[in-house]
Amino acid sequence: MAATKHRASKPGPISPNSSTKVWLFSLLLTIQYGAQPLISKRFTRREVIVTSSVLACEVVKVVSAFILMAKDGTLKRLYKEWTLIDSLTASGLPAAIYALQNSLLQISYKNLDSLTFSMLNQTKLFFTALFTYIILGQRQSIQQIGALFLLIIAAILLSIGEGSSKASSTDSPDEILFYGIVPVLVASVLSGLASALCQWATQVKKHASYLMTVEMSVIGSLCLLASAHKSPDGTAIRQHGFFYGWTPLTLIPVTMNAVGGILVGLVTSYAGGVRKGFVIVSALLVTALLQFVFDGKPPSPYCLVAFPLVITSISIYQKYPYRLKKKD
């Protein structure tokens, strides 16, 4: 939880008990990430306004986090120890960075072909490792850096297999550079920075994962409401109502997405942003598997090539952590 009296210190090694939690949360998040596209496609009608489902997800996330805090006893201490400054320091900056990152990605995707976008977007894994070192002092071994290379290659292959073959929407090199390449690279840098800041807040400042989830959800919702004032979604909500196109089944993907948001916080808190990257890429394989099982869509050749790369990269990253060299 938010601890104003805790002294900042570098995160120590993961204990056996925490290691079990890391694997459990990572597995659950992988399944959630992998299943979310299919669940959303099956249970969310086209008429549903995107902003309404996102805001509903944030509400479910906040309520769930409060319930979990009440269960583990941190909610009682929240009233005495919570401060606005701590909240803005721990959650406000990452939330603002993520909002800017998403906007940059939307701009970039419209001006780049899928392959270029996927390749540049996956550099966020390296920037996460870089900022984790700068902010937290956590180093990567040579083997782990190699594992990150393998993971990025796998992510690119999976993105090619699942993505479209759309061409760039413009032939102007300057527009491709300034409205395509530059935005996605800046977004990757921001993604790595925000991930490292979240890890710093939970591991060093001892800001509780559940509390951080609540704070980032509230800040994100306020930003979304502000932007919806003049957006097409805002107009649609005013004309048709907040729950336009909803059915009782719409709550399934909304709730599942909220659970995923809580799991992201837990994985970042226990394992860090770099390992979260492994989870997200692994989830693409789960999506391909579920599409084959439920939709009869066979995995692409890219997916089959990427599978051993993901397994190998995870194995190497876990087996060869960075170790300080002993002085003679």
Say what each PLM segment does.
Residues M1-D328:
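Polytopic endomembrane small-metabolite transporters, centered on the Drug/Metabolite Transporter
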